[in-house]
Structure formats: C-alpha cells, structure tokens
A protein has these predicted regions:
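Secretory/exported precursors with cleavable N-terminal leaders
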Residues: 2-418
Length: 418
C-alpha cells in the first residue's frame, strides 16, 4: 500500500479546504451581488414609472465598495449592510479583483467600458493610505474638483503621496469616455455646500456581437403591445436557433419564460424575461423577483430549438443615486452631519452626489446599423416561439461569475430617449 508522507497529507487537506472556502465565498458573493442588483432595480422601478429602464448593478456596487475603503463608523456599517460584505476583508478584495479582471477581458466582438471616478474638493488633504488603495482598485480614479466652480476640475488622478493643483475644464465626455456630453452635465450638477464634498461618478457602456447573429434581412416591422394596450410597429429581429430556454413561476404562481442568448465567446449572455400571460403586467413580475429565482434559472434552462422574435432597442439612463441609495440603507454618506469618511481625509467629507450613467444597444449584430427595409415572409415552423412583442425584462450577465452587468426593462422599443 502506498503511504503518503504526513507533510503531503497536510498539503492535500489544505488544498481541499482552500478550494472549499473559495467556492463557498464565490457562492456567497454571487448571491449577495444578485440580491443587491434586484433591490437596486426594484427601487428604481418605483420612481421610473412605465418608462424604459437600465442600470448597471455591478458598476454601482463597485462605487460603493470604493467608498467603503474610506468609510468608518456607522457610514461603513451602512455600506457594508447594503452590499452584504466588507471590502476591507482580504478574501473579498481578492474575489472582487478577479471578478473585475474576468469582466475586463475585451475580446473580439465584445467591448465593455466601466469607470468609477471619485471627485474630491480641491485643497482637501487626503490620507496617503486611501490614495494608495484607490489607485489599486479596478477601473477607478480619484480626481480633484472645484465644487465652487462646477466647470473646473483637476485633470490628474491622485497618486499616493502626491497632490494635484492644476485646474482644467471638464470637457464633454471626459469622465464617460464615449458617453459623449455627459461630462458637462455632471460638472454642472456639482454644487458647493458648507463642508468639503465628494462626488461619485460611475459610467458603463457595452457593445457585443451575438454568438449567432440575427440576419438583417429577417427584421420586420411588427406589432408591439404597450403596457396601456396601445399597439405600435417596431423593428422586430428574427432567427431560428437552439438556445437556452425555461419556464418558471413566481411565488404567486404567475408563469414567465426566460430566454438566454449568448454573446460571441460565450462569456456574457443576455437573458430576456417575459410574462407568459399577456394579461400579466410586467410590474407584477418585477416586484416578485428574488435572488433565489435567478439562481433557479441556471439549473432550469434547457437547450431548445426555437423561433425567436426580439425587438431592436437602444437606451441610455442617467441617475443621481443620492435619491435612490437611502432606500437601500445608505443614508449617512450623503448627510453632512453624519458622514464619516475619516479614512479618506480628516476634513469632514460627505458625498454630495452619486451619478450613474449607463447605455446599451441591442441590434442584429450588436453594432450600429441602418434599419432594414425589406419585408420578409417567414416559413411556418413547428418549433416553439419566443416573441417579445410586449414589455419585458432583460439581464446581461457574466456567465462565470454570475455578475449582473446590466438589468433593465423595455417598455417601448421605439423610445430611445435618455
């Protein structure tokens, strides 16, 4: 019989335990991220009424995690309670770093831009420890801002041990990259109060190519029934394909279907969620979404040959999360009398604004294209049909980590207003 040395046995047990701990942490973080995503989305639906909506939960959570690095006392407790984890934990930091690295992989056919910028009042003395941590945080930067003159900021991000004093004009799109025009709007929104301020700006944009592209020649102008019962004509994409599909029920026994369309490389997928009954309002499904339901999709989707009808849509939303996050438990950070960011500076900072800007475009191939003009007659098929011809939810998820990059709804595909 082969006998392993004691040292080898110890190493084996250590590797098994480490693997178990990593898997346990990954499962826990996945559920916490999903819970936060749903809570954030459901809170936004209460204020956005029946309009198109999109939000990037992973981008917002990244911003709150950055604030955690400098928060103390009850401010830290609220941020930790909302996210469900403390980023000061080394294991959590490692997990988040790996997750960001996985999502940052811009391969052929996929482009993802995510930034988080912390604007801090010019002249405030920052603690070197915080600037060092912030510089190591994925896709983030700390920038000087003159809140008394909204069109003046400081161009260079903070580096550990250095202060920047040069001012510059915040050009349109300077914060948001390709989200043109947003920079000036963000600058104008900054205002000077009685205490030094922090403004948090995060932006995210995605463009991807389908694993199996829709043919432009199959796109037709077809009816789409709005929530008020009115019918409009929209550009409806079509393809026959084998996809992941499942039927589910909410806690109140309302039936709904989930269709999953992978992007090129299969690291990301778009999940389209549609009430099975036409009379079921989308708001009813939105209110009953839970992390457990989303987890059940992973095991409940089956490969199915289907005829797929999906409207082409494009949307962009801008939010000041200052009016949203208190409902999720983050209030002290925005309160000049209660905020505790002594891990950033000893000069009494608070968050004046938290801007979130996000956009998405879904077309036949994932890129901008002119509308197809040809009308096509499609042959009859015995395959099941998934037809998103009424309001629906969508989630763009990272397959490996389960992170929800985007979550939103399409109430009117023809409405492209931001």
């Amino acid at each position: 019989m082969c006998r392993l040395p004691v040292a080898s046995l110890i190493i084996c047990f250590w590797l098994v335990e480490r693997s178990y701990c990593n898997n346990s942490l990954q499962d826990s973080m996945r559920e916490l991220h999903t819970r936060f995503a749903i809570s954030l989305y459901q809170t936004l639906t209460e204020t956005e009424n029946n309009s198109n909506l999109i939000v990037s939960p992973v981008s917002v959570s990244l911003s709150l995690a950055l604030l955690q690095l400098g928060a103390r006392g009850n401010t830290l407790a609220q941020l930790e309670g909302t996210l469900g984890y403390n980023v000061n934990d080394a294991h959590v930091q490692d997990f988040l770093s790996h997750s960001q690295a996985n999502m940052k992989n811009n391969s052929q056919g996929m482009w993802l831009q995510q930034t988080c910028t912390l604007f801090i009042q010019s002249g405030v003395q920052l603690l070197p420890g915080f600037t060092q941590l912030a510089s190591e945080w994925a896709n983030t930067s700390v920038v000087r801002a003159n809140f008394s003159q909204p069109n003046q900021t400081h161009s260079q991000p903070e580096r550990a041990g250095h202060q920047q004093d040069e001012s510059w004009h915040l050009l349109a799109g300077s914060v948001s990259g390709e989200l043109s025009g947003s920079g000036e709007a963000q600058a104008e929104a900054l205002w000077w109060g009685h205490r030094p301020q922090v403004a948090l700006v995060n932006t995210v944009a995605f463009k991807g190519v389908w694993q199996k592209q829709f043919m432009f020649t199959n796109t037709q102008n077809l009816p789409f029934v709005l929530s008020d019962g009115n019918v409009i004509k929209v550009a409806m994409m079509y393809q026959a394909a084998e996809v992941s599909f499942g039927q589910f029920r909410t806690a109140s026994e309302q039936r709904y279907t989930v269709l999953q369309l992978p992007y090129l490389g299969r690291s990301l997928s778009l999940q389209v969620v549609l009430p099975s009954e036409r009379k079921t309002p989308l708001s009813s499904l939105e209110a009953q979404l839970t992390a457990r339901q989303l987890a059940s999709w992973d095991g409940g989707l089956r490969r199915t040959k289907m005829d797929i009808f999906l409207p082409r849509f494009k949307m962009q939303n801008k939010f000041n999360l200052r009016s949203v996050l208190p409902a999720l438990g983050v209030s002290d950070a925005f309160n000049p009398a209660a905020a505790d960011f002594t891990g950033i500076s000893e000069e009494g900072l608070y968050v004046s604004d938290a801007f979130h800007e996000v956009r998405i475009e879904v077309t036949e191939d994932g890129t901008k294209a002119a509308a197809a003009t040809a009308m096509v007659l499609l042959k009859r098929s015995r395959a099941p049909v998934f037809k998103a011809d009424r309001p629906f939810l969508f989630l763009l998820r990272h397959i490996k980590t389960g992170s929800i990059l985007f979550m939103g709804r399409v109430m009117n595909p023809a409405d492209q207003a931001s």
